[in-house]
């Protein structure tokens, strides 16, 4: 698990930076590329729910094979000049006569408007981490099987497809803060619907995966690519990964575990939903104040 977390956390930001830049250069819609991952995830979770529930160890062999193929495909990726660091000329020390390389310092982002976006990213990951971590346990507590978990996860993945088809129109029509506010609000609504423990309402909660997580993911990745300084795209995406997979995931797991132990999983869903609404309101007000 440690090895997976270390390598996955390091590879994903660089992968996002490369894919977004290559999509822009070749004029390919990034949403279509992301849709391939959505469809494959839907197929995998549906298969796992029905066929691997009695042989769960096969999942690890399957994941290992997929990561091996992923590594081989990465070897075919072309170089991307936009992700290279901008090299400043070396300076000569007048005393020693030797050249000294300048440190790669300076701001990563062009504007402080990025900080409310990072707060939205943290809030989304905080909520989705608790949601995902305790969804399976919650279903088992209610007496449902792993098959239902596979179906629900498949529904959530398929709900991302309409969003990916429309995300460029939405991005042109609405500002980033408006989209992120709506996305985190949908995440809070998902938690409230899931707490009902009713299968139709839980399915409705999964249908909000696209309007919540996918909108937040797409807006954050593409916005950061526009807001980074030249040569610091990978650092910008790494900052997003630290906020999401680092701070957001860790907080969601630790605080979520405390809430689940103290109040129960269902009550934890409701508490975190209200926390998300509070954070969203604060970030939205801050973003509006900065613009004004």
Protein language model regions, located:
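Helix-loop junctions at membrane interfaces in 12-TM secondary transporters
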Residues: 1, 194-206
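Helix-to-loop junctions at the C-terminal end of transmembrane segments
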Residues: 51-52, 162-175, 260-261
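Intracellular juxtamembrane helix-capping segments at the cytosolic ends
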Residues: 9-24, 215-229
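Juxtamembrane intracellular "pre-TM" segments in multi-pass secondary transporters
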Residues: 78-121
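Structural signature of the two symmetry-related core transmembrane helices
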Residues: 178-193
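Helix-loop boundary and gating motifs at the non-cytosolic
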Residues: 113-152
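Multi-pass alpha-helical transporter architecture, strongest
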Residues: 67-82, 246, 271-292
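A membrane-interface helix-boundary motif in multi-pass transporters
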Residues: 50-67, 257-276
């Amino acid at each position: 698990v440690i090895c997976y977390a270390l390598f996955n956390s390091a590879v994903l930001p660089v992968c996002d930076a490369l894919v977004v830049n290559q999509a822009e250069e070749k004029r390919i819609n990034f949403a279509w590329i992301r849709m391939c991952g959505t469809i494959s995830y839907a197929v995998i979770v549906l298969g796992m729910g029905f066929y691997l529930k009695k042989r769960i160890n096969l999942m690890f062999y399957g994941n290992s094979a997929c990561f091996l193929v992923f590594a081989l495909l990465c070897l075919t990726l072309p170089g991307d000049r936009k992700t290279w660091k901008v090299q400043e000329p070396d300076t000569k020390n007048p005393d020693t006569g030797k050249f000294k390389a300048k440190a790669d310092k300076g701001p990563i982002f062009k504007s402080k408007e990025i900080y409310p976006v990072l707060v939205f990213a943290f809030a989304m990951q905080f909520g989705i981490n608790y949601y995902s971590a305790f969804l399976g346990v919650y279903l088992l507590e209610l007496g449902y099987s792993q098959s239902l978990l596979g179906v629900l996860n498949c529904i959530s993945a398929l709900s991302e497809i309409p969003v990916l088809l429309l995300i460029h129109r939405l991005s042109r029509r609405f500002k980033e803060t408006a989209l992120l506010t709506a996305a985190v609000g949908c995440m809070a609504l998902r938690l409230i619907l899931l707490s009902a423990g009713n299968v139709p309402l839980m399915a409705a909660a999964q249908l909000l995966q696209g309007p919540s997580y996918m909108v937040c993911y797409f807006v954050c990745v593409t916005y950061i690519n526009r807001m980074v300084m030249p040569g610091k795209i990978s650092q910008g995406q790494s900052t997003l990964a630290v906020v999401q997979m680092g701070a957001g995931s860790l907080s969601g797991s630790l605080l979520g575990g405390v809430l689940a132990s103290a109040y129960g999983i269902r009550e934890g869903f409701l508490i975190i939903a209200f926390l998300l609404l509070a954070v969203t309101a604060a970030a939205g007000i801050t973003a509006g104040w900065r613009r004004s």
